[in-house]
UniProtKB/Swiss-Prot annotation:
Kelch repeats lie at residues 130-178, 179-224, 226-272, 274-317, 324-370. Keywords: Kelch repeat, Repeat. The keyword Amino-acid biosynthesis does not apply. The keyword Repeat applies. It comes from Arabidopsis thaliana. This is F-box/kelch-repeat protein At2g29830. It holds the Pfam family F-box. Residues 27-73 form the F-box domain. Residues 1-21 are annotated as: Disordered. InterPro entries: F-box-like_dom_sf (IPR036047), F-box/kelch-repeat_ARATH (IPR050354), F-box_dom (IPR001810), Kelch-typ_b-propeller (IPR015915), Kelch_1 (IPR006652).
Length: 383
């Protein structure tokens, strides 16, 4: 089951029904322990239990919202994956962040109220517990933005980072060798079509590079992935890759094997292999996987349409959830139903290099989103 995260309440809020005397009487043993030891003990408890733990006392409420606890979780290697989704609604409405969480109820998708609405077409990457959100625009025919923010997913707080050198919307981005590369999202211009962000020095640098001739003039892309140390970019009529170490580009046209099934955002990379949703079942299965070394697509065995809810490719998104495959989406949002489903699929290799999938869970995670919502992207963060 995709058990993700629960964000506790504001530690500054006082419970009017609390009895301060009772709380003091319950704390002597706890207060005798070193704070570092307390944090190490609580760090071993899954985050989904933190809301219940916060009811014990003010001290616990403070602890589970402290940076020390998350440092302890990281040091102990007890971080957990959390799935985030950027969901937009009607045209010209800025999308908002949602995340999946579980407490004592079934898995549910919840809006993060502490984060402001994002720009549509923003490029997003994750590093540990942080999400970097770059560029975007309010809507079609609106100016692009060069703004960059970083979101701390432990506390759902955010701050601005230095702007990119160019304003970009629907750019491609990926992390290679610990640095964030951003490509396109603006009209082709060799001098600064590619930028790189150093997360240590918090600075942007232009990467001189010749634009691939096949890329569209506006530089707006459908989706992007990182595979084998290269940033693969899906354009409107072609796809291409960029290898930053040597600055090499490679292109594939619409008739290539790579673009046979890679034609929408319902795709992601797991274990350096590209997975895509193909509800036409051209290979007799709804999920296919691309082997870049062999330049061939194969079906993911063990998963059939009977195992999945009713989905459409343009309303569904794939994500790498800590080595598992997650499908977040639903059917035609123009119909009366606006349900969003979450499907978790474990992946394993059998019989040489054949990928098999095992459906671990299928659940409705939202029933009340507005009609015609669009899941722009999904990202997994470790917290």
């Amino acid at each position: 089951m995709v058990v993700l995260s629960e964000i506790p309440g504001d530690p500054n809020e006082d419970n009017q029904n609390e009895n301060p005397q009772e709380e003091v009487e319950n704390l002597p043993i706890l207060l005798q322990l070193p704070e570092e030891l307390i944090a190490s003990i609580v760090a071993l408890i899954p985050r989904c239990h933190y809301p219940s733990l916060s009811l014990v006392s003010r001290a616990f409420r403070h602890l589970i919202t402290s940076q020390e606890l998350y440092v302890a979780r990281s040091n102990l290697g007890f971080t957990e994956p959390v799935l985030y989704a950027l969901i937009g609604f009607q045209a010209y409405t800025r999308p908002s962040w949602f995340f999946l969480r579980r407490s004592n109820f079934p898995l549910q998708l919840h809006r993060i109220r502490s984060l402001p609405p994002m720009l549509s077409g923003a490029a997003v990457v994750t590093i540990d517990y942080k999400m970097y959100v770059m560029g975007g625009c309010i809507g079609y025919n609106h100016p692009a933005s060069s703004n960059v923010i970083v979101i701390d997913c432990r506390f759902h707080t955010w701050k601005y980072l230095p702007d990119m050198k160019r304003a970009r919307c629907r750019a491609a981005t990926g992390i290679i060798d610990g640095r964030i590369y951003v490509i396109g999202g603006c009209k082709k211009q060799d001098a600064d079509w590619v930028e790189v962000f150093d997360v240590t020095t918090q600075s942007w640098e232009t990467v001189p590079s010749e634009c691939p001739n096949d890329a569209n003039e506006n530089g707006e892309f459908i989706t992007y992935v990182v595979m084998q140390g290269r940033l693969f970019i899906l354009d409107l009529e072609c796809c291409f890759s960029y290898e930053p170490v040597q600055g090499l580009w490679e292109s594939w046209d619409d008739g290539s094997e790579l673009m046979r099934f890679w034609h929408s955002s319902s795709s992601c990379v797991v274990g350096d292999l590209l997975y895509a949703l193909d509800l036409t079942c051209a290979l007799e299965h709804p999920i296919v996987v691309y082997y870049p070394n062999e330049l061939v697509w194969r079906p993911v065995m063990g998963v059939d349409t009977a195992h999945l809810p009713i989905l459409t490719e343009y309303t569904s998104t794939l994500a790498n959830f800590d080595g598992k495959l997650v499908i977040l989406g639903g059917g035609d949002c123009s119909e009366s139903s606006s349900e969003i489903w979450c499907v978790e699929i474990a992946l394993e290799t059998r019989q040489g290099d054949q990928i098999w999938g095992v459906v671990k869970s299928v659940s409705i995670v939202s029933r009340d989103l507005p009609m015609r919502h669009v899941i722009e992207l999904c990202r997994t963060v470790m917290v």
